[in-house]
């Protein structure tokens, strides 16, 4: 299992987490080899990371997790998911086609054709109400939404949806 600490916990980019219950598989996939390497008798950190010399990346991740605690992380993850589901439902109710099952914090939406989808995305970005990006899905242009800030509220989602609707209506007129 891998988790992106940056996307979920808003830690620096290089704070990924790997959970593996097979110690031998983890070590063999990450271990550097060389006759010059001196291994310690205790748990050696270089056996569990893809490089041997690195800064203490774990500090930011550890501090965030320590501050939030189990319940804080739980509230964050479930809160992001709830707001993402809200985003998907409000967009669907407003006439957008939601293409994915919302399993965490991503929504893919499209309009009736690629041209209107592209224009809608451009107008949403120009509005500066929220940020989303474009992508391709099944040979169609889509708008990719990622709800990833702990500070995002239900009202923020509704305001963002209003920006989507305004942009969509304007794109259809052009």
Feature-to-residue mapping (PLM):
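Active-site C-terminal subdomain of aminotransferase-like
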Residues: 2-94, 99
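Short, hydrophobic beta-strand segments
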Residues: 63-64, 108-109, 143-147
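A short linear hydrophobic-aromatic micro-motif
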Residues: 94-97, 129-134
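Conserved PLP-binding catalytic core of the aspartate aminotransferase-like
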Residues: 96-124
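Short Gly/Ser/Thr- and Asp/Glu-enriched loop/turn motifs at secondary-structure junctions
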Residues: 100-105, 136-142
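Short amphipathic alpha-helices in soluble, non-transmembrane regions
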Residues: 118-126, 158-165
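A common structural junction motif
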Residues: 124-132, 165-172
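PLP-dependent enzyme catalytic core of the Aspartate aminotransferase-like
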Residues: 137-174
């Amino acid at each position: 299992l891998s988790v992106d600490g940056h996307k979920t916990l808003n830690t620096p980019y290089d704070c990924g987490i790997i959970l593996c219950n097979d110690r031998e598989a983890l070590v063999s996939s990450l271990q550097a080899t060389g006759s010059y390497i001196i291994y310690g008798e205790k748990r050696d950190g270089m056996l569990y990371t893809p490089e041997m010399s690195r800064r203490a990346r774990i500090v930011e991740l550890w501090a965030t997790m320590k501050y939030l605690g189990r319940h804080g992380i739980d509230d964050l993850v479930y809160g992001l998911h709830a707001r993402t589901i809200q985003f998907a439902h409000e967009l669907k109710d407003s006439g957008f086609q939601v293409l994915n099952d919302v399993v965490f914090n991503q929504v893919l939406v499209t309009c009736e054709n690629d041209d209107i989808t592209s224009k809608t995305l451009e107008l949403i970005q120009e509005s500066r109400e929220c940020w989303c990006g474009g992508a391709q899905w099944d040979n169609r242009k889509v708008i990719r939404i990622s709800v990833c800030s702990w500070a995002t509220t239900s009202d923020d989602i509704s305001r963002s949806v209003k920006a989507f609707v305004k942009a969509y209506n304007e794109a259809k007129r052009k």
